[in-house]
Design a protein with these regions (language model features):
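Walker A/P-loop NTP-binding motif of AAA+ ATPase domains
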Residues: 66-275, 280, 292
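Interdomain "pre-motor" coupling segment immediately N-terminal to P-loop NTPase/helicase cores
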Residues: 34-71
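Intrinsically disordered, low-complexity N-terminal extensions of AAA+/P-loop NTPases
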Residues: 9, 325-327
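AAA+ ATPase "lid" subdomain C-terminal helix
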Residues: 275-307, 314-322
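Extended, hydrophilic extramembrane loops/domains of integral membrane proteins
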Residues: 4-35
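Proline-centered turn/helix-capping motifs that create local helix->coil transitions or kinks
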Residues: 62, 263-264, 321
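Phosphoinositide-dependent membrane-docking surfaces
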Residues: 1
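Hydrophobic alpha-helical transmembrane segments in multi-pass membrane proteins
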Residues: 51-56, 167, 171-175, 287
Length: 327
């Protein structure tokens, strides 16, 4: 502690008995506690550090906003580029008509959910819907809203919809939607509470714009059952389309696309291959065919054989967890 008397300041040990300060004041001696001063300094440094972290997080959020939320005027994808799923494409034509002529529509949906296993073209459908409608396309994913700083995710949701409103007519596409749209857990950890804030902000933003105002939200998920009931009620996400693994007819169309420029042995007809690929996603079929072509080249074969397909499937199974069905 410091003792000041007659213009002199001395540092002395604190006797620390009950009436010490009173005795010093009676004698006109002022005292100060170094510990208190140190605490003040530490508190000030802590406040400065907290402010610096907050400003850095805000800077990162603004940088993320400018670098992540890009709008695309033309996606270059049409419904004709998508194999199969004719019923979904036909149904989406009515949405295209509504997006092009909002004044003629009595009621438009605010949101559409595309659900189904990965690798079957949910993103492709969203891009085609924007291109066919002639509107801007703004794509993001659920993981973009999650981070280490509490409250930042909700801020990003607000940024997303602000940009969408500025770029309308616009389709907002959110991939991996279940990562932010899961059922809320009010008794969970800090991460759960942050996810609750993100979801609540998303609900508020969707409630904040009216249908027919030029913003349509399309969300893709592999787990529709995990979504919060508040999301999928009428007035928010009104429509749901299942983008499933391709059927026999669609697999034959995919073989025509992915097999272009490749030669198959005479026993591998499109019908046989389509049966062999039963149960695989569109992306898995593409991977197996491309890998089979590489195997054909490595063995200097004239055509892709069933052995190439089996070897390719075995190799891809390690990466994609797929199984080949052989006749």
């Amino acid at each position: 502690m410091k003792v000041k008397s007659e213009g002199k300041t001395l540092s002395v040990p604190n006797p620390d008995y009950p009436t010490f300060k009173k005795d010093m004041l009676v004698r006109g001696i002022s005292i100060s506690d170094d510990t208190t001063t140190l605490d003040d300094i530490l508190n000030t440094l802590f406040n400065i550090l907290f402010l610096a972290i907050f400003l850095f997080a805000l800077y990162k959020a603004l940088s993320w906003y400018s670098s992540t939320f890009h709008t695309v005027r033309h996606t270059g994808v049409h419904f004709s580029d998508i194999a199969g799923m004719d019923e979904v494409k036909k149904d989406m034509e009515s949405i295209v008509k509504e997006m092009k002529n909002p004044e003629e529509s009595k009621k438009r949906v605010k949101g559409i959910i595309l659900e189904g296993p990965p690798g079957n073209g949910k993103t492709l459908f969203a891009r085609a819907l924007a291109e066919e409608s002639g509107v801007n396309f703004l794509a993001t994913k659920g993981a973009d809203f999650q981070g280490a700083v509490m409250g930042l995710g909700a801020m990003k949701v607000k940024m997303l919809f602000k940009k969408a409103r500025n770029k309308k007519p616009c389709i907002v596409f959110i991939d991996e939607f279940d990562s932010i749209g899961e059922k809320r857990n009010y008794a969970g950890s800090g991460i759960d509470k942050e996810n609750n804030r993100i979801l609540t902000t998303l609900l508020n933003e969707m409630d904040g714009f009216s249908s027919g105002k030029g913003v349509l939200v399309v969300a893709a998920t592999n787990s529709f059952q995990s979504l919060d009931p508040a999301l999928i009620r009428p007035g928010r996400f009104d429509l749901k389309y299942t983008i499933s693994n391709p059927d026999q007819k669609t697999r034959m169309e995919l073989l025509e696309i992915y097999g272009k420029g490749k030669t198959f042995s005479s026993d591998l007809t499109p019908q046989i291959l389509a049966t062999v690929f039963d149960g695989l996603s569109s992306a898995a079929i593409e991977s197996v065919i491309n890998e089979a072509e590489e195997i054909r080249r490595s063995y200097n074969k004239e055509a892709i054989t069933i052995e190439c397909i089996v070897a390719s499937a075995s190799k891809c199974r390690e990466k994609l967890n797929i199984k080949i069905k052989k006749n």
